[in-house]
Regions:
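Flexible "arm" and connector segments at domain edges
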Residues: 1-61, 67-193, 197-256
Length: 256
């Protein structure tokens, strides 16, 4: 696809948005606030398409998200706050500033250096912003822990290597075990359990594993294996709740 075709396709979307915003009873009443939960839903649908490795569905979901981005820009324009040009120029400038090794004279040897430079550049340009200011509170907790550890590592607050990071996991595991010796103190148990989860999430940065991706794959594996257990129960004319634990374990192992 050449440049003209891309521009024409984008203009077509903008024109359609202008039309539905002006004439559709539903589109004309939407606000930035009313669209928020719908955008979250669309993002999760894109995530599911990616997990399913369904590129045709990824294409469709990207279109849905693109519509939402144009929708927000249209509302911003109506309110005199910003328009699509401001949005696009803003991200273009951000990309140029954050890639001095592409658009400037800086040299980097690997992706880790690029990430560290990003954090340095952001702090220099936004003097009063916390290192963790770019991690939304609304992120799922496991992913948020991973990103917080990643962000602080970018400014040097990190273990030297994966071995040290794992030692922290072992330390937190021991502290949780000790807390469990007093099970009535549920607040302390919860705190230590949280510390262990955070340490495991942070450890992912040292072994190149995103914990959210890893857990998602394990969730999928668990679902598929338990579906096999349920299928084996149906073959016997039983509900899964009527299987013995030994039977469940045997069918579970079959699914591995």
């Amino acid at each position: 696809m050449n440049m003209d075709e891309r521009l024409q396709a984008f203009k077509r979307l903008l024109d359609i948005m202008d039309a539905v915003r002006a004439g559709c009873p539903w589109d004309s009443t939407q606000t930035i606030q009313s669209l928020r939960h719908l955008t979250i839903e669309e993002t999760y649908e894109l995530s599911q398409a990616i997990l399913n490795d369904d590129l045709n569905e990824v294409k469709k979901e990207l279109g849905d998200l693109m519509l939402h981005l144009v929708f927000y820009a249209k509302i911003g324009q109506e309110q005199g706050a910003f328009d699509i040009t401001d949005v696009l120029n803003g991200i273009c400038e951000k990309m140029i500033v954050r890639h001095p090794h592409i658009f400037g004279s800086e040299h980097v040897d690997n992706a880790e250096q690029v990430e560290r430079n990003w954090e340095k550049i952001k702090l220099e340009r936004e003097h009063n912003r916390s290192v963790l200011g770019g991690v939304p509170d609304g992120l799922p907790s496991l992913l948020k822990a991973y990103r917080m550890a990643q962000k602080t590592a970018g400014v040097g607050f990190r273990w030297l290597d994966a071995t040290q990071a794992w030692q922290k996991v072992e330390e937190e595991k021991t502290e949780l075990f000790e807390a469990l010796q007093t099970p009535a103190d549920t607040a302390h148990v919860e705190e230590e359990y949280g510390d262990l989860l955070f340490a495991l999430a942070a450890y992912g940065n040292y072994i190149g594993v995103n914990p959210d991706d890893a857990l998602e794959k394990t969730d999928k594996k668990f679902r598929e294996r338990f579906a096999h257990v349920e299928q084996r129960a149906r073959e016997q004319g039983k509900g899964v709740q009527h299987l013995t634990l030994d039977e469940m374990i045997a069918y579970w192992k079959e699914a591995k």
